[in-house]
């Protein structure tokens, strides 16, 4: 039986999405400020699933989870998840920086995104909705976290490590803009797909947009089809044109992984750290939004 959340007061709505709303809340006993995620009835059960994923992940690279249960909202009890309040998402920070990050910032973020995805994969889950909105810094702005596990799924048995069988009849799960090509083509998602989405995020941050943004369609399915066709027609070489060769190498490597292959996360991080070093830059944690002087110059770094 689901317990009632009694000591949390909802203070201010800060986000709203297809699955529910997120509030700033306050613990009326300790005065601690928290985040509270509420579930819309149409998606009943998704928040409980997300709570289970957070518990399975253990909390060292995810926000702390304080409580799950029923909470009174607008005179109705709904499912609620009380968790550590986070800072801004990468999408919010991207907007702050006029929708363009410097190469240094993107490479440092890439290293940290790979770290978070590797942590998730080692605990037998794939995220299936990797995008800038789902990477957030803590309130201090020191550490990057991957959040929103409502679509996360075990890709292998946690006891035997037997991989889930590949299916080729799946509908699109996640956000079409950042979904891997194979996700559009109906393949069951695995580790390679999360990492392809990381690659798309880096291209987005460096170029300001992806080629399949803004496509017009009459229906959602038609739009998905047009995005798929765009991803099929644009080679990775074309996608990464004008960017450091390491970004292309990253995207090419993950695109060519097999369904059950374990990615070489260390190799991917090395690609990004090498790109920094060749430019005479250090992964020092100083990002564009901290200094507010982002530079888009590629300098002498070899590009495609």
Swiss-Prot record:
Q: Does the keyword Nucleus apply?
A: yes
What is one term from the GO cellular component aspect held by the record?
nucleus
Q: Which reaction does it catalyse?
A: L-seryl-[protein] + ATP = O-phospho-L-seryl-[protein] + ADP + H(+); L-threonyl-[protein] + ATP = O-phospho-L-threonyl-[protein] + ADP + H(+)
Sorted alphabetically, the keyword list is: ATP-binding, DNA damage, DNA repair, Kinase, Nucleotide-binding, Nucleus, Serine/threonine-protein kinase, Transferase
Q: What is its main location?
A: nucleus
* Top EC class for this record: transferase
Q: Which InterPro entries match?
A: CK1_Ser-Thr_kinase, Kinase-like_dom_sf, Prot_kinase_dom, Ser/Thr_kinase_AS
Occurrences of domain Protein kinase (ranges)? 8-304
- CDD domains noted in UniProt: STKc_CK1
* PANTHER family the record matches: CASEIN KINASE-RELATED (PTHR11909)
Query: What is the protein's given name?
Result: Probable casein kinase I homolog ECU03_0910
Specify the taxonomic lineage.
Answer: Eukaryota, Fungi, Fungi incertae sedis, Microsporidia, Unikaryonidae
């Amino acid at each position: 039986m689901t317990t009632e959340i009694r000591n949390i007061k909802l203070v201010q709505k800060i986000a709203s999405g297809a699955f529910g709303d997120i509030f700033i809340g306050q613990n009326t006993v300790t005065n601690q400020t928290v985040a509270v995620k509420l579930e819309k009835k149409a998606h009943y059960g998704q928040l409980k699933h997300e709570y289970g994923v957070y518990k399975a992940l253990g909390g060292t690279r995810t926000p702390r989870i304080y409580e799950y249960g029923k909470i009174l909202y607008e005179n109705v009890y709904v499912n609620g998840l009380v968790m550590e309040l986070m800072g801004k998402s990468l999408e919010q920070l991207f907007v702050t920086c006029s929708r363009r990050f410097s190469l240094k910032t993107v490479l440092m973020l890439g290293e940290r995104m790979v770290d978070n995805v590797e942590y998730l994969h080692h605990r037998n889950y794939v995220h299936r909705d990797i995008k800038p909105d789902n990477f957030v810094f803590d309130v201090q702005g020191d550490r990057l976290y991957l959040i929103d596990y409502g679509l996360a799924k075990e890709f292998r048995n946690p006891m035997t490590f037997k991989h889930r069988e590949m299916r080729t009849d799946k509908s699109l799960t996640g956000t079409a803009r950042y979904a891997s090509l194979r996700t559009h083509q109906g393949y069951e998602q695995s580790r390679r797909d999360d990492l392809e989405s990381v690659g798309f995020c880096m291209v987005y941050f460096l170029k300001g947009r992806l080629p399949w943004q803004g496509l017009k369609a009459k229906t959602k399915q038609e739009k998905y089809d047009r995005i798929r066709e765009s991803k099929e027609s644009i080679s990775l070489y074309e996608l990464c044109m004008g960017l450091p060769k390491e970004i292309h190498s990253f995207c090419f490597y993950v695109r060519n992984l097999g369904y059950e292959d374990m990615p070489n996360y260390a190799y991917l991080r090395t690609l990004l750290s090498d790109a920094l070093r060749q430019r005479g830059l250090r992964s020092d944690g100083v990002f564009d939004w901290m200094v507010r002087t982002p530079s888009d110059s590629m300098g002498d770094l070899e590009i495609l």
